[in-house]
Amino acid sequence: MKSLVIVFVVLLGVAMISANEEELLAILQDQRNDARGGCMNRYKSNICGTLVTPMNCIAPRTRMGKFARKFCQFMCGIC
């Protein structure tokens, strides 16, 4: 009985996601059109590219890596 309830809840969730497909596609299209709006290069001339390099983007536990992923997103390929 519990597994039947779980199956119905999962099917209901899938149906809700499928029903809003057009709305989700519209949101995705808006984000793609405005992708550069959230990716500002505030440290273009002095830090990103000179002090912080693309290799810092892949360092998960370093301060430089955290800084690169937060402020040099264009360089890390996040944008």
From Swiss-Prot:
Main localization (coarse): secreted
Signal peptide positions on this chain: 1-19
Subcellular location field: Secreted; Nematocyst
Propeptide stretch(es), residue numbers: 20-36
Keywords assigned: Nematocyst, Secreted, Signal, Toxin
The keyword Cell inner membrane appears for this protein: no
Any one Gene Ontology cellular component term annotated for this protein: nematocyst
UniProt key word Signal: yes
GO molecular function term, any single one: toxin activity
Family under the similarity heading: Belongs to the sea anemone 8 toxin family.
Protein name: U-actitoxin-Avd8a
